């Protein structure tokens, strides 16, 4: 059995890069956020890979990936609308039906399901800025082929 999360993360990064724009500018997508990054941005990271179905012919795993949306505004301006809009775009691109699943066949995997496990919103009112964050959790059931 092989680790599929790296391929899922790569597929998500590829699908989202230069695909979501706010105010005429593309929202950057990172796995590792650089120190000079400015908001808004999206961070994609792996959470877990658990074997889910046990049968004699194939390995099936449930792979969970999170996408964190980070926006920020001066303390007395802006709001969470921008994070809502970015989350909506993410879900339209990532949470698809079977015809839109990632093609991982060249990596030896087949995507069986894609599920939105939920979106959680946070607001952090700090001295310099107010940060609006959203965590999108996506679960993919993956078959080793």
Regions found by a protein language model. Name each.
Residues 1-27, 32, 47-145:
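Charged, amphipathic alpha-helical segments and their flanking helix caps
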Residues 35:
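Short, charge-patterned binding micro-sites
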Residues 38-49:
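A short, hydrophobic beta-strand-centered structural micro-motif
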């Amino acid at each position: 059995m092989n680790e599929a999360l790296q391929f899922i993360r790569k597929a998500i990064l590829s699908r989202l890069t230069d695909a979501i724009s706010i105010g005429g500018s593309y929202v950057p997508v990172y796995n590792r956020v650089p120190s000079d990054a400015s908001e808004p941005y999206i961070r994609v990271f792996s959470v877990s890979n658990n074997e889910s179905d046990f049968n004699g012919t194939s390995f099936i795993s449930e792979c969970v990936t999170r996408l964190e949306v980070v926006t920020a505004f001066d303390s007395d301006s802006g709001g969470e609308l921008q994070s809502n809009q970015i989350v909506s775009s993410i879900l339209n691109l990532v949470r698809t039906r079977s015809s839109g699943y990632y093609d991982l066949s060249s990596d030896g995997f087949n995507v069986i399901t894609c599920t939105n496990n939920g979106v959680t919103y946070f607001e952090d009112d700090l001295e310099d800025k107010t940060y609006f964050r959203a965590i999108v959790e996506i679960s993919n059931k993956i078959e080793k082929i």
